Amino acid sequence: MIKFASFLKFRVQINGGRYWSSSPLRSVSNYVKFVFMDNAFKKYSIDTTDYQVGQDNVQKWGFDIHNPVFGISAGLVVFCLISLLLVEPVTARDALNGIKNGIIEQFDAFFMWSTNFFLLFAVGLLFSPLGKIRLGGKEATPDHSTVSWLSMLFAAGMGIGLLFWSVAEPTAYFTDWWGTPLNAEAYSADAKSLAMGATMFHWGVHGWSIYALVALALAFFAFNKGLPLSLRAAFYPIFGDRAWGWLGHVIDILAVLSTLFGLATSLGLGAQQATSGINHVFGLNGGIGTQMVVIAFVTFIAVLSVVRGIDGGVKLLSNVNMIVAFALLIFITFITFDTAMGSLVDTTMAYIQNIIPLSNPHGREDETWMHGWTVFYWAWWVSWSPFVGMFIARVSKGRTVREFLFAVIVIPTLVTLVWMSVFGGIALDQVVNKVGELGANGLTDISLTLFHVYDVLPYSSVISILSIVLILVFFITSSDSGSLVIDSITAGGKIDAPVPQRIFWACIEGSIAAVMLWVGGKEALQALQSGVVATGLPFTFVLLLMCVSLVKGLRTELSAYR
């Protein structure tokens, strides 16, 4: 026994003197605790995990799929579609609208304060020492030029909404279409200022901070820690190897469904809007047939884009998109210079003056407006964050955290400020001065509001055709980038999924939009949209937890930058 005790002392001292004890049993106990705690620490450390990207994948029929995520996602897509199509579209829309509205009404303060927190958290990271950390490692270099990088993140993050809502949203606020911000009197000077300020509030730094934090977490854990480019990887510092199990499966499946149905909804509703524009400009009377042609065209070009990959497809289209968008913006500014410049100054001041009152959910007299617009917007931004965040992450290797946050939050907000000021300012000017359709009847058909504004401008036909082209390109860039994101998630976080897999998801997006439009019309798409917005609630909890995980991860690399 004495020799055995001496042996224990010797072994325990070798593994660390602080575990030595004169009691043999205590020595054994301490040593066992040491071994198991040390192994547990290694198991849950992002620097020592032995998980390999794609280790759970199955290769078959030219696909490289993560078995549970791909199969369950595909099955749930079919189940959701059949369920929506078997039920009367209006009934499905009303039921899902009820769920969405219940979530918005019960969790309004939670959505508002969470979004405020995301903005403050992002600003804190930007100015903290953690901002020096580079995505991909200290010596990493960017994969894309700054211009192409900004073009891709902006095209994926904004899309068609920038065109339609830049005129429709301020007009709606000014004319009391669904309440007015801060209960301002409709058609008053205060209502005009608040209309522009509130529009920018919904499209500015708050929303982009949501995208930025998701993108930053995904990029850091993928490029700095070698983890899969999937949502689950961002939670490894908290959940350890459980992130690779069913907890992670559920997170990724929710991300796939939210992305897929969100894109399909936008594509379907956008096809209706594009068809309305084509009919208005060319004097046609196209209906569901034209909408199917638009969806088929967008899907076909998106397939070509995803086949060519980031550099040959998505980046090229995004650059073309930005060129066309800036050409349109410059031309509109030139022909309405005085109105545009005056609106830019007024909108900037209105945004700065009202950002705090609009961010506060308590004691509001405009609760109906806040629920119908602000809380809906925050839920929508959050529900889209897995898609947009993952795409931004994929193209952001080589940027520092500080550079990344500034570019993703500030630059798009400044571009949006100029865009909204010009287009929204022109629309409100027409309403105030009783010019054109907006001046005579106000907001009647949202899908045609942009073209109603153009009708009273010089070269209206040229501007309208250019806008239709821009609408289609925005559709394509959203579809192809979304397909690449879904490919990555369902491939177990692999960045380059096989070509057949990319084609599969791009076609599925278009097919869902076409089927929903053909069978259920606008009501079916609105039901799908309400379902997507409802996912904003669980994803908000996920994002709050992601902030904790991100800080834990970033702190492991801070010592290399001191």
UniProtKB/Swiss-Prot annotation:
GO annotation, cellular component aspect: plasma membrane
Keyword Transcription regulation: no
Keywords: Amino-acid transport, Cell inner membrane, Cell membrane, Membrane, Stress response, Transmembrane, Transmembrane helix, Transport
Disulfide bond sites: none
Keyword Transcription: no
Highest taxon of the lineage: Bacteria
An MF annotation (GO) of this entry: transmembrane transporter activity
Annotated GO biological process: amino acid transport
Localization, UniProt: Cell inner membrane
Induction or repression: Induced by NaCl upshock.
Record membrane topology: Multi-pass membrane protein
Positions of transmembrane segments: 68-88, 110-130, 147-167, 203-223, 243-263, 287-307, 322-342, 373-393, 404-424, 456-476, 503-523, 531-551
InterPro entries: BCCT_CS, BCCT_transptr
Principal location: membrane
Its biological purpose: Involved in the uptake of osmoprotectants. Can transport glycine betaine, proline, choline and ectoine.
Family: Belongs to the BCCT transporter (TC 2.A.15) family.
Stored PANTHER family: HIGH-AFFINITY CHOLINE TRANSPORT PROTEIN (PTHR30047:SF7), HIGH-AFFINITY CHOLINE TRANSPORT PROTEIN-RELATED (PTHR30047)
Protein name: Glycine betaine/proline/choline/ectoine transporter VP1456
